[in-house]
Design a protein with these regions (language model features):
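Class I Rossmann-like S-adenosyl-L-methionine
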Residues: 1-117
């Protein structure tokens, strides 16, 4: 049976994986660091205890980067502002990760929205 502690742990893991993904995406896109190097040196990524959490972060970040043009086009179509005017800049990365989960990954809609809001 699932108890409150289990639910809390699952929620914490979901939020943590998204925070680590955001940090990695920010470092790669805004600081022009190589993706493999960022994975190897990211304290947040290294600290993830579960291999499935590390795999999820890798999948989300690599898919976001691979599909960046498509994701940015979807955001541009849905936003009143040009992507370059979305502030703070990390908000654009949060939107990118959310769109990636909704469109390109098998993440349930409620989970993607809940974890990215």
């Amino acid at each position: 049976m699932i108890n409150n502690d289990t639910i809390s742990e699952l929620t914490d893991n979901a939020i943590l994986t998204r925070e680590v993904s955001l940090q990695i995406l920010h470092t790669v896109l805004d600081k022009s660091q190589p993706l493999d190097q960022v994975f190897d040196n990211s304290n947040g990524f290294i600290a993830l205890k579960e291999s499935r959490d590390r795999a999820f972060v890798k999948m989300m970040v690599t898919t976001t980067i691979r599909r960046l043009g498509q994701i940015d086009d979807l955001i541009k179509r849905a936003s009143a502002k040009p992507n370059k005017d979305i502030n703070p800049p990390k908000l654009l990365h949060i939107l990118r990760l959310g769109v990636c989960q909704l469109v390109f990954m098998d993440v349930p809609n409620y989970a993607a929205v809940d974890s990215m809001v």
